[in-house]
Amino acid sequence: MSHTEALALIRAEAGESGLHVAARMGEDLEPTRVARLATAIRVVADGLRGAASIDRELAASLHILGFLVSREAGSWTSRTQKLPQAVFDSLIDLESAVEDLFFDISR
């Protein structure tokens, strides 16, 4: 995936019909969709490595995807109903990708 494609995917998934809306509505989150998004974030992170700042719109999109998606998804769970392990793992990977970009960490 190119840097431009990755940015487009990040912005789309943070938008009106994106992943965070699906999580807010209680829809099933496909681990492959989340994994593709994490890959896109890592592509963008590689392109920004060493940069002193990032675009405000990108930062807002990353905040939505890295922190609000898992919070929204978690709000639909209960003591008796948990997120499927594959979904949970993919959301943790998504959060890690966002944190790595913000802190300029290469793994």
Ranges and model annotations:
Residues 63-107:
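Amphipathic alpha-helical binding modules
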Residues 1-38:
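Short terminal alpha-helical segments
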Residues 17-26, 44, 48-51, 72-79, ...:
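Secondary-structure edge/capping motif, primarily at the C-terminal ends of alpha-helices
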Residues 49-63, 78-81:
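Short, charged early-sequence alpha-helical segments and their helix-coil boundaries
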Residues 5-10, 19, 23, 44, ...:
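Generic structural signal of hydrophobic/aromatic residues within well-ordered alpha-helices
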Residues 5-6, 33, 37, 54-61, ...:
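Residue-level detector of well-ordered alpha-helical segments, enriched
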Residues 16, 27-28, 46, 55, ...:
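Acidic-enriched, low-complexity/disordered segments with a strong bias for Aspartate over Glutamate
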